[in-house]
Regions:
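Short S/T/G/P-rich N-terminal loop/turn motif that feeds into the first structured element of a domain
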Residues: 19-106, 111-229, 239-258
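Bacterial Sec-dependent N-terminal signal peptides
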Residues: 1-24
C-alpha cells in the first residue's frame, strides 16, 4: 500500500512539474546570417523586421533577440544573429514550415524569399540548437538603463577537448555555482545553454549584457577577483574544461525585442 501511495505521489509531482513548465521556453535557436554587402544587409533587415519577427510574435515568441556585431565592423563577412525561444525541439521545424506556408508574411518578405541565386539575400546561415541550463533554463530580459547604441551583449562559446570535459564545464556552471556567481555580480545574463547541435561541438554558449563597454570590463574585473571564482579555479575536477573561448561583442538591432 505504501508503494502504491509513493508511486501516486510521484506521478502527481511529475504532473505538477509538467504543468509548471508547459509554457516555458527552454530551447533556443540561434541563427547566424552571414553576408558580405550592404544590399544583402538591407534585404535581411527588411525581412527580419517586417516579416519574420512579426510572424514569430504572432506565433507566441514575444521576446526575440536580433543582434549585429558591436562597433565598427570591418570584416569582409558580416553577421546578424537571431535568438528564438522554443518550448520543445519539435517546434523548430514546425515553425520553419509554418512560415513558408504563410502567404501574408511570405509576401511581405518577398525580396528575401524570392532572392535569386545571382543576387542572394545572404551567403550562408549557421544554426545552433540550444537547451537552457538546468539552473537557468529560460531566456531572461536584461535590467539595463542605457540605450541600444551603448549596450553591449557578450556572446561566449566555450569549446571543450572532449565530451567528458564539456560535461564537467556544464556542471561547473550549474552545481559548481558559476551561474549563481554571474547572477550575484549582476551580469544581466540573457541565457546559458548547452549546444545540442552546432558546428563547434562539444561546446556551451551563454550571453551576458552590460550598460556599455566600461561597465562590461568592470564586471569581469569583479568576477576575476571574486573568492568564489578563485575557489572554482583551484578545483582539479574543473581544470582544463575549456579548450577554446570564442567571445563576440554584439549590439541589439533597433527592431530587436532586447
Amino acid at each position: 500500500m505504501k508503494v502504491i501511495f509513493f508511486l501516486f505521489t510521484l506521478a502527481l509531482s511529475f504532473d505538477s512539474f509538467a504543468q509548471t513548465n508547459k509554457d516555458k521556453y527552454h530551447f533556443f535557436e540561434l541563427k547566424v546570417y552571414e553576408y558580405s554587402s550592404l544590399e544583402q544587409e538591407k534585404v535581411i533587415d527588411e525581412f527580419l523586421s517586417s516579416s519574420f519577427l512579426p510572424f514569430l510574435h504572432k506565433n507566441g515568441r514575444s521576446k526575440v533577440g536580433i543582434f549585429s556585431n558591436y562597433g565598427n565592423d570591418t570584416s569582409a563577412i558580416k553577421k546578424i544573429y537571431v535568438l528564438i525561444p522554443h518550448k520543445s525541439l519539435n517546434e523548430i521545424p514546425v515553425l520553419q514550415k509554418a512560415f513558408f506556408q504563410d502567404k501574408e508574411y511570405m509576401a511581405i518578405g518577398k525580396n528575401y524569399v524570392d532572392a535569386s541565386s545571382s543576387q542572394p539575400a545572404y551567403n550562408r546561415i549557421t544554426t545552433y540548437i540550444l537547451e537552457g541550463f538546468r539552473f537557468a533554463p529560460n531566456l531572461m530580459l536584461p535590467n539595463l538603463k542605457s540605450g541600444n547604441n551603448d549596450r553591449v551583449y557578450e556572446l561566449r562559446s566555450y569549446e571543450s577537448a572532449s565530451e567528458k570535459k564539456y560535461w564537467k564545464k556544464v556542471e561547473m556552471f550549474n552545481e559548481g555555482g558559476e551561474v549563481d556567481l554571474f547572477a550575484r555580480l549582476n551580469f544581466n545574463a540573457i541565457f546559458y545553454a548547452e549546444v545540442i547541435s552546432g558546428p563547434t561541438m562539444p561546446n556551451l554558449m551563454y550571453m551576458t549584457s552590460f550598460e556599455n563597454m566600461n561597465d562590461r570590463n568592470e564586471h569581469w574585473k569583479a568576477f576575476s577577483n571574486d573568492p568564489k571564482w578563485k575557489e572554482l579555479l583551484s578545483m582539479k575536477e574543473y581544470d582544463q574544461t575549456v579548450s577554446k573561448n570564442v567571445t563576440t561583442f554584439l549590439k541589439a538591432k533597433a527592431y530587436s525585442d532586447y
